[in-house]
Amino acid sequence: MNYIVIVAGGKGERMGNEVPKQFLLIGEKPILMHTIERFHEYDKTLKIILVLPEEQQNLWKELCSKYSFTIEHQIVNGGTTRFESSLNGLSQIPEGNDGLVGIHDGVRPFVSVNTIKRCYDEAQLTCAAIPVMPLTESLRIVEKNGNSKSVERANYYNVQTPQVFNIMMAKMAFAQPYQESFTDDATVMEQFGCKISLVEGNQENIKITTPLDLKLAEILINEKQPKD
């Protein structure tokens, strides 16, 4: 059996808004509902685990009632770090399950179904897969002495979610002590010794964290389904 852990722990501070960013409206309903719908569209048998701060859970339930949102999902308390939140989600998966689990940012509602499929298909073959997109702007690295130099853009990618892993390997990897070098879930797996496979993401799969992102999201939601 396959799972998706959707981590939604934002507080909306960078938005300058008291409403948690995952609850902000685009297309007349909360961002988080669009995100969950995308995975349900990919696979209606996928088990959905929503990781949400405890103090936000009553509001979420009220929103589900208000917007008649009925896609089945399990709610789990968020942690103080992304690592802890992902771990809390993984802990709800029964032991001995040899399926796949994706971990996804709750504020990425425009991930395409084909991107999701590519991640799960590749992880089935290789144990760990993440979606990436090539960079389009030039890069420079700043050295300790303050000097900078250009770096080869082709060697770098923007990393997206969902990041999909073998469940048993993910549970073992997240049993490691937390390290500050864990910038995302894939780095936890990498530290454990898993090779990370890269698959093509989709350009619209933005993480909505700033007012500008929200404006872009409002444009995207009024267009047709995300391109692959």
List PLM regions with ranges.
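N-terminal glycine-rich phosphate-binding loop and ensuing alpha1 helix
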Residues: 1-58
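Residue-level signal for inorganic ion chemistry
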Residues: 6, 23, 32, 89, ...
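A general structural signal for well-ordered alpha-helical segments in protein cores
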Residues: 57-60, 83-86, 116, 132, ...
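Conserved beta-loop-beta/alpha segment of the NTase-like Rossmann-fold superfamily
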Residues: 80-142, 146, 160
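Conserved alpha/beta core of the MobA/IspD/sugar-nucleotide pyrophosphorylase nucleotidyltransferase superfamily
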Residues: 157-228
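A recurrent flexible, glycine/aromatic-enriched loop bordering the glycosyltransferase active site
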Residues: 149-159
